[in-house]
């Protein structure tokens, strides 16, 4: 039986009942947060691993032996099988043709973005990005500048911190014609938590 205070709370905030599934998920998959009296708010920066992920990973490691995926012995072939299976899964998830795309693994998002900056053909091109990008995305502009690309920031509008759609449409309508164009924006801003339209 809920306490009188909790019953009063539910009467005042009836929509709270709709969060029961989230509470159950937290209790099952993230009990360590409650055990340590923690609140985790950096989901756009790094997703919290679930208890089921820990258990599955533990099972995988305890039942197998994996070696260097660049060799040809049985343990290395087992690791290669996992890596290649993961590549295939990622491409399938994004409906990306494996004849046209390749999934590359890096140590972290910053490493992946640096790889883009180092390898993208910016010469005579354009790099368009929003003001609320992650700092590593902003770092790509140095590679773009060094190769002679035009770099343009799209502002966010106060108070809701959303991209100025009219300015974005203007900028998207005038691509560089002598080089490649790259537009970078976060699906969800790790500064404001705003979710941007993925259709851009």
Region locations from a protein language model:
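Pyridoxal 5′-phosphate
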Residues: 1-200
């Amino acid at each position: 039986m809920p306490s009188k205070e909790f019953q009063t709370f539910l009467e005042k905030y009836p929509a709270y009942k709709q969060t029961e599934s989230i509470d159950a998920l937290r209790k099952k998959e993230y009990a360590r947060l409650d055990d340590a009296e923690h609140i985790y708010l950096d989901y756009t920066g790094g997703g919290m691993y679930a208890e089921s992920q820990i258990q599955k990973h533990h099972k995988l490691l305890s039942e197998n032996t994996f070696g260097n995926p660049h060799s040809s012995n049985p343990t290395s072939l087992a690791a290669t099988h996992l890596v290649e299976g993961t590549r295939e899964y990622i491409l399938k998830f994004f409906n990306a043709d494996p004849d046209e795309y390749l999934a590359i693994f890096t140590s972290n998002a910053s490493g992946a973005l640096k790889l883009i900056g180092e390898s993208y053909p910016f010469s005579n091109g354009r790099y368009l990005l929003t003001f609320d990008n992650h700092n590593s995305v902003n770092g790509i502009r140095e590679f773009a500048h060094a190769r002679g690309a035009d770099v343009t920031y799209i502002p966010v509008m106060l108070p809701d911190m959303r991209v100025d759609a009219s300015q974005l449409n203007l900028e998207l309508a005038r691509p560089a014609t002598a080089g490649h164009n790259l537009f970078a924006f976060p699906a969800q801003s790790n500064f404001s938590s705003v979710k941007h339209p993925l259709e851009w």
